């Protein structure tokens, strides 16, 4: 097997594969034939610089076609792609290099200094540079499902980022979620907005669309809510994949409106508030299908395509995946997950994430095992509190954590970022408490409300609850 051969070379050469939109809105379209040729020639250049089967190639390239060419070139050779987000600093890159020892680096023109500052002594290929696409095309290596293909680092929500190694089967295995959750169809244009460098982008930016015969949209530039909607309309996007934070921001800060081209939308990476799901369905005309997975596992469950969406739920296990709840924790049988990382554990994989399952088999996320708040014997998921507070018009973003309490053991502490036009006050804090009591069970309301200008987050945008718990963020 070889992803480059099986899904790029084998596709109709005239079929649209990629649409790239630069920050200045310059536009580039590439067919599968063009991607096959350019990635094969780039693979020839990588091979000439010493990269081969099993070698790690680090990429530090933004959401542009050059990044896709580099990833596919690695897989053509049987090399291991290590995509890195552009937000990483030299110290972050150096730590990754020390862990996985890349043979060479493919870097865009804006981040050469960051790579140089690491002291990396191997070859560095700067893109765009047409000379790298002039080598003789490299033939696809014959690979097995367990041959390594991709190494990604966990986001470090609860500790130092660690590498996770995936095999060739991870790439072809994306067909499961692409069909049953992501929802790509032949001829679609799919836009996964995740930045290059994360596991979500590695599987959904172009792999998931391609295994279903669809095209992928790559857009450079910072997140701007109104521009996000403009791009969906201008490019006639069929399938949209965004982080819940982005869906919330677009709903609250942009002029959300009917999006006639958009047939399907998915969210993953953190829980999606029920009110945001409803707002998108009512205003944009599309139901957002939440999903769940991990860096180690790939997608595990998602809101099914077809039945009505259940706002607030992350759906059901994908077909064939054996997933269950044990003492409140999500567990899975690695043997049933086609995208599980190499060298799986003996026995079940305990995710460390907590959820409940209703009588219809739908899963409802509660939080990380160490995020669940135990107050006076009540088990409170932070997402429940956050969802309640997020429906208040003054709230832009919020996070709930436990705070020590002599009587109750712990109480709920909410840290709130306000929308423009609202100022922190004791009166507003009391108003938010009463709002939460009205929106959810009274025992869940935050007995402590604090205001902050922003929430501490990892480079991938996840809230650092541990930082909030120790009080250093406010």
What is each of the regions a protein language model found here?
Residues 13-16, 136-153, 160, 183-189:
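Conserved pre-ATP/AMP-binding loop-to-beta segment of ANL
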Residues 22-24, 28, 104-146, 160:
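ANL superfamily adenylate-forming
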Residues 172-192, 196-239, 252-253:
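Conserved AMP-binding/adenylation subdomain of ANL enzymes
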Residues 237-242, 251-309, 322:
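Gly/Ser/Thr-rich phosphate-binding loop
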Residues 36-44, 145, 164-185, 193-194, ...:
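Conserved structural elements of the adenylate-forming
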Residues 28-33, 149-173:
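Conserved AMP-binding A3 loop
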Residues 88, 240, 325, 334, ...:
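AMP-binding/adenylate-forming catalytic core of the ANL superfamily
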Residues 14, 18-64, 68-72, 89-94, ...:
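Conserved AMP-binding/adenylate-forming core of the ANL superfamily
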């Amino acid at each position: 097997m070889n992803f480059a051969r099986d899904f790029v070379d084998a596709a109709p050469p005239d079929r649209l594969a990629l649409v790239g939109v630069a920050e200045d809105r310059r536009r580039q379209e590439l067919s599968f034939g063009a991607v096959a040729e350019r990635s094969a020639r780039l693979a020839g250049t990588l091979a000439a610089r010493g990269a081969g089967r099993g070698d790690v190639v680090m990429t530090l390239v933004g959401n542009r076609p050059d990044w896709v060419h580099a990833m596919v070139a690695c897989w053509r050779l049987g090399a291991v792609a290590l995509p890195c987000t552009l937000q990483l600093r030299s110290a972050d890159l150096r730590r990754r290099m020390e862990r996985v020892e890349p043979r060479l680096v493919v870097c865009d023109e804006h981040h050469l200094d960051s790579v140089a500052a690491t002291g990396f002594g191997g070859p560095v290929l700067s893109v765009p540079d047409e000379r790298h696409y002039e080598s003789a095309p490299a033939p696809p290596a014959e690979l097995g499902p367990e041959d390594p293909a991709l190494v990604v680092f966990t986001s470090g929500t609860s500790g130092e980022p660690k590498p996770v190694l995936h095999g060739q089967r991870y790439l072809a295995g994306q067909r499961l979620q692409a069909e049953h959750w992501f929802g790509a169809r032949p001829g679609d244009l799919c836009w996964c907005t995740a930045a290059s460098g994360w596991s979500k982008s590695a599987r959904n930016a172009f792999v998931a669309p391609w295994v279903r015969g669809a095209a992928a949209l790559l857009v450079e530039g910072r997140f701007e809510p109104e521009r996000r909607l403009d791009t969906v309309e201008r490019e006639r996007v069929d399938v949209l994949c965004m982080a819940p934070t982005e869906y919330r921001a677009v709903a609250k800060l942009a002029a959300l409106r009917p999006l006639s081209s958009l047939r399907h939308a998915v969210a993953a990476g953190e829980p999606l508030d029920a009110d945001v799901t409803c707002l998108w369905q009512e205003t944009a005309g599309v139901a957002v299908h939440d999903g769940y997975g991990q860096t180690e596992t790939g997608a595990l469950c998602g809101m099914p395509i077809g039945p009505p969406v259940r706002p607030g739920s992350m759906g059901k296990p994908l077909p064939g995946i054996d997933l269950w709840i044990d003492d409140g924790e999500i567990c899975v049988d690695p043997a049933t997950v086609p995208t599980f990382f190499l060298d799986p554990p003996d026995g079940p994989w305990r995710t460390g994430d907590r959820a409940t399952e209703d009588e219809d088999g739908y899963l409802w996320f509660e939080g990380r095992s160490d995020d669940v708040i135990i107050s006076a014997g009540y088990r409170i998921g932070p997402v429940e509190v956050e969802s309640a507070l997020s429906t208040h018009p003054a709230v832009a973003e919020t996070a709930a954590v436990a705070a020590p309490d002599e009587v109750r053991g712990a109480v709920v502490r909410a840290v709130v970022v306000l929308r423009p036009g609202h100022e922190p006050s004791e009166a507003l804090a009391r108003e938010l408490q009463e709002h939460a009591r009205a929106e959810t069970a009274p025992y869940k309301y935050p007995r402590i409300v604090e205001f902050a200008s922003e929430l501490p987050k990892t480079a991938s945008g996840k809230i650092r609850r541990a930082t909030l718990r120790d009080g250093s963020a406010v």
